[in-house]
């Protein structure tokens, strides 16, 4: 397993070991806590030597991400190198039927993926759950709130950017991790963030576990 230079993954080299912990666990473990059969990170000597000081082998972590989206035989032909993160991201989007432009930036495609996950989750929520979510996210008039209305609210949040967009991203990532590896992010949020996470985690988990079976990672 070798790292292929990727400008979209270079930021990993600026992260601290504790910040990389959740990512490493997600890459190496299944929902039941067992080590993934297809991962190579934990078998690497550099990993064994420095774990859990993840920042000392961030390139191996990046390489593991790249290998998620690569065909095993093709990876061997490429000298053990996987594919760039954008290709991994687009492969996930294709299998989850996300509408995106392949010429868009990684950030834009990631945003489309997040909105797809949110949209599918909202469509699975009951009117009572939608109302509770609307209240938790600060919507003033929650009477007759629909999934379409909440999609519009979240789209506006992402377009506006800033801290609310960051919070919403954390909520989605937290729910995705819970669905994939059985645990969320190692962080403590404020009351509103925690409440919104609790409301969304179930529906997002249903979406992710239903669609992830089609994705070979």
Residue ranges and their predicted role:
Residues 1-155:
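Terminal export/targeting leaders at protein ends
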Residues 142-217:
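Membrane-inserting effector segments that mediate pore formation, membrane fusion
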């Amino acid at each position: 397993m070798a790292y292929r230079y990727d400008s979209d993954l270079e930021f990993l080299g600026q992260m601290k070991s504790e910040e990389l912990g959740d990512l490493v666990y997600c890459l190496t473990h299944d929902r039941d806590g067992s080590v993934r059969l297809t991962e190579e990170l934990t078998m690497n000597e550099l990993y064994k030597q420095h774990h859990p000081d993840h920042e000392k082998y961030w390139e191996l972590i990046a390489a593991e991400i790249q290998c998620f989206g690569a065909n095993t035989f093709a990876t061997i032909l490429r000298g053990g190198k996987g594919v760039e993160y954008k290709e991994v991201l687009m492969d996930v989007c294709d299998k989850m039927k996300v509408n995106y432009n392949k010429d868009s930036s990684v950030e834009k495609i990631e945003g489309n993926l997040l909105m797809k996950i949110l949209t599918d989750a909202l469509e699975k929520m009951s009117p009572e759950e939608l109302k509770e979510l609307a209240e938790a996210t600060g919507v003033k008039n929650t009477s007759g709130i629909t999934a379409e209305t909440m999609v519009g609210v979240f789209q506006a949040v992402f377009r506006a950017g800033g801290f609310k967009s960051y919070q919403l991203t954390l909520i989605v990532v937290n729910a995705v991790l819970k669905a994939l590896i059985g645990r969320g992010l190692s962080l403590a949020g404020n009351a509103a963030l925690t409440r919104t996470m609790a409301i969304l985690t179930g529906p997002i988990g249903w979406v992710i576990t239903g669609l992830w079976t089609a994705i070979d990672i």
